[in-house]
Amino acid sequence: MNQEGASHSPSSTSTEPVRARWSPKPEQILILESIFNSGTVNPPKDETVRIRKMLEKFGAVGDANVFYWFQNRRSRSRRRHRQLLAATTAAATSIGAEDHQHMTAMSMHQYPCSNNEIDLGFGSCSNLSANYFLNGSSSSQIPSFFLGLSSSSGGCENNNGMENLFKMYGHESDHNHQQQHHSSNAASVLNPSDQNSNSQYEQEGFMTVFINGVPMEVTKGAIDMKTMFGDDSVLLHSSGLPLPTDEFGFLMHSLQHGQTYFLVPRQT
């Protein structure tokens, strides 16, 4: 019936016609994102069929739609990762020339702070965040990455696997209706090539945060820090406090839309 869509289908067993442009519903996006974040980024044929059957509870979908969604999602994830690494490298390079000057100024107490505050370049932070950076040591041990960074907001102000996921969405689908819609101009700036079949759902289930001053589009809920950034990085809030992760490398709390964060090397 739709020969063009069927010709590109990865040997689909679905009997329904494949729509050339599939706009998944919020409930379907939530399921797909949960599966992707659980580590299944390239499901085999039998898993694709299972996912498609689960998505059909909320609207028409074909195996090819599921296949291409995961293909596009992997591409976007790799692109965001490259953009973040490039932004981090550029930020570290731009502050390198001023590093020595900042540290000399701090050691000479030209920019004194009270006993309860220390200036790290992005506003005054309490002793709690200061102790995280200084570890009770002299200011000369502050990592150079923190010096010169500034926050646009000013000063400080379990995954149970694929099987449980399928079981959960078999009888708890009502929670999916709590999905909120966020519209962000940053998505079109960072991903101009995705303004086709994906344009209607990229903004659903996503939010925009600022990491090292760069607007980034991330998923709501738990984020796999280990997969996205590796074992040697820590994500900090603009207040200077590190975001805790569980034993599997997932953030224990969701990022907040519009907030500023910093990706820094883990201290040893």
Swiss-Prot record:
Places the protein is found: Nucleus
**Which parts of this chain are annotated as the region Disordered?**
1-22, 173-198
Q: Which UniProt keywords apply?
A: Developmental protein, DNA-binding, Homeobox, Nucleus, Transcription, Transcription regulation
- Supply the Gene3D superfamilies for this chain: Homeodomain-like
Q: One GO molecular-function annotation for this sequence?
A: DNA-binding transcription factor activity
Report whether Kinase shows up as a keyword of the record.
Answer: no
Q: Which residues bind DNA?
A: 17-81
Bias class Polar residues marks the residues at: 1-16
What the entry lists under SUPFAM superfamilies is as follows: Homeodomain-like
Its GO CC terms are: nucleus
* Listed GO biological process terms: adventitious root development
What Pfam families does the entry give? Homeodomain (PF00046)
Family, per entry: Belongs to the WUS homeobox family.
Described purpose of this protein according to its UniProt entry: Transcription factor which may be involved in developmental processes.
What name does this protein carry?
A: WUSCHEL-related homeobox 12
Protein's gene: WOX12
